[in-house]
UniProtKB/Swiss-Prot annotation:
PANTHER family, A to Z: UPF0310 PROTEIN MJECL36 (PTHR39661:SF1)
Protein name: UPF0310 protein AF_2356
InterPro entries named among the record's database cross-references: EVE_domain, PUA-like_sf, UPF0310
Family: Belongs to the UPF0310 family.
Origin: domain of life: Archaea
Length: 147
């Protein structure tokens, strides 16, 4: 089993929660191809301005993959600025494990996370990625903060 940090925004988090589907652009096909049924996915929402309020980067849920990767270009996700008409066609069905009552703010975790080797420029470990594999140790650490 592998553990993944899935990077999204507020709008697409609503879609994930409602439809139990994760999708990535074609350019991330090599990454999503490594995901197997039963893997655990942590949903990470990037810092963004929502209705005039800056919401910090945070982890909002954990899911288990319930399918292999499949292709579907139907427009269910909202294409973020700068991504044109992206439909996130490479998708995986999800099964919710836990949607956190209180999101876990990400920045306080940075000093403790093994996968973030450059603690000062930590966003470089996530920037431009749709998802990235993380060590089981980091997954467990994050879940400790969810209680």
């Amino acid at each position: 089993m592998a553990y993944w940090l899935c990077i999204t925004n507020e709008d697409n988090w609503r879609v994930i929660k409602e439809k139990n589907i994760w999708g990535v652009p074609e350019r991330h096909k090599n990454t999503i191809a490594k995901v197997k049924k039963g893997d655990k996915l942590l949903i990470y929402i990037k810092q963004e301005n929502v209705n005039g309020e800056v919401k910090p980067s945070r982890i909002v849920a954990v899911y288990e993959t319930a399918s292999e990767v499949y292709r579907d270009s139907s427009r269910i996700f909202k294409s973020p600025k700068g991504m044109g008409n992206e439909t996130f066609p490479l998708r995986i069905k999800l099964k919710p494990v836990k949607i956190f009552d209180r999101p876990i703010e990400f920045k306080p975790l940075i000093p403790k996370l093994k996968f973030i080797t450059n603690k000062r420029k930590w966003s470089g470990h996530l920037m431009g990625k749709a998802m990235r594999e993380i060590p089981e140790e980091d997954y467990r650490l994050i879940l400790e903060y969810a209680t």
